[in-house]
Amino acid sequence: MRNLSTEFKEQQNSGNRNYLKYADFTFTDGSTLSITDKDLWSNGFNFEDAVSQSGSFDIGAAIVNKLTLQINNFSGKYTDYIWDGARVVCYIGLELSTGIEKIRICTMTVTDAPYQSTAIISLTCEDSMRLFDRDYSESKLTYPATRLQIIQDACEVCGVTLQSTRFDNDDFVIQNRPNDNSITFRQVIAWVAQMGCQWAKSDEYGRLCLGWYERE
């Protein structure tokens, strides 16, 4: 859950959607770039944060969420950047009485950046859930194994930090290893989450979380 100030929540509840947008890039060569609203086209910042497929209510979803950016390249100053593989951390902000409050919303990797020398650079970015799209045959975990051990193993093999170091019924033991001839780590994660009536998602820092909807 993201930490928001009381005033930020009040502004949202009153209908204020005048969000300021920020994206900080780290390129594969180690160089960095920060862009803000003035560098983006209108409606050029779209972020998915789903834990269920569109039009359905899923238990055990493990969705790769996406971010699309459309950068204003009218001056040509961004033409020579190598966007593919860049890490991007995005924030939104609101003008409050105490100044601008920025909230981190995602950590993504640019996965599609067709070369464009035009006025618009369109980037498609995906979160760390995509890293689990590897054959489960790579896992050397011995079964029986607990739900927590299966999730820990998936994170270790795929190079993703686990945020949910404990979760409901994480000690439930699964006796038999799934047939790994044609399944991925992400499918196994979804299966483990479904067994606990939970979802799995990548948080704003790119860590794997297992949880469920908050009840107020």
Residue map of PLM features:
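Assembly/oligomerization scaffold segments
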Residues: 1-144, 153, 157, 177-197, ...
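Surface-exposed aromatic
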Residues: 168-179
